[in-house]
């Protein structure tokens, strides 16, 4: 089993539990160059809010999309957009990534922005 399969296995366990609870979730995905965040409905079929370092609004604020500063900007932006959509409480879906570095920075910025999880 390689590193990617291990991460996907962890992600599958988390998503199965969140699907069982029908919880609105904040899903995070990261690559070497970018980080993406989506608020997904409890049924799992609708994206209610999204933010990423690919967007021009974020790219104008940060030079590099693959660092903690960029993750903090995305975290604040996703919290702002989720609150605008009427969402206060979410379940954090780290997609099998360790809660460290950019994933942690995004989560803490989203909490500072007003999301509860």
Curated annotation (Swiss-Prot):
Task: Name the UniProt key words of this record, in alphabetical order.
Answer: Ribonucleoprotein, Ribosomal protein, RNA-binding, rRNA-binding
One GO BP annotation is: translation
Q: Which domain of life is it from?
A: Bacteria
Entry GO CC: cytosolic large ribosomal subunit
Q: Which InterPro entries match?
A: Ribosomal_uL18_bac-type, Ribosomal_uL18_bac/euk
| Entry keyword annotation includes Manganese | no
Annotated GO MF terms: 5S rRNA binding; structural constituent of ribosome
Q: Does the keyword RNA-binding apply?
A: yes
Q: Which SUPFAM superfamilies match?
A: Translational machinery components
Show the HAMAP family listed in the entry.
Answer: Ribosomal_uL18_B
Record note on quaternary structure: Part of the 50S ribosomal subunit; part of the 5S rRNA/L5/L18/L25 subcomplex. Contacts the 5S and 23S rRNAs.
Family, similarity comment = Belongs to the universal ribosomal protein uL18 family.
What the protein does? This is one of the proteins that bind and probably mediate the attachment of the 5S RNA into the large ribosomal subunit, where it forms part of the central protuberance.
NCBIfam families in UniProt: L18_bact
Q: What is this protein called?
A: Large ribosomal subunit protein uL18
Say which species the protein is native to.
Azoarcus sp. (strain BH72)
Q: What is the lineage of its organism?
A: Bacteria, Pseudomonadati, Pseudomonadota, Betaproteobacteria, Rhodocyclales
């Amino acid at each position: 089993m390689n590193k990617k399969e291990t991460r996907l296995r962890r992600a599958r366990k988390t998503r199965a539990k969140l699907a069982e609870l029908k919880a609105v979730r904040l899903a995070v995905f990261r690559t070497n160059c970018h980080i993406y965040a989506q608020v997904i409905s409890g049924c799992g079929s609708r994206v209610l809010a999204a933010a990423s370092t690919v967007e021009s609004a974020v790219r104008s604020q940060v030079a590099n999309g693959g660092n903690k500063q960029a993750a903090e900007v995305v975290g604040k932006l996703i919290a702002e957009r989720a609150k605008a959509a009427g969402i206060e409480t979410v379940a954090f879906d780290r997609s099998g990534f360790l809660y460290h570095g950019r994933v942690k920075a995004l989560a803490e910025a989203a909490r500072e922005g007003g999301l509860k999880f």
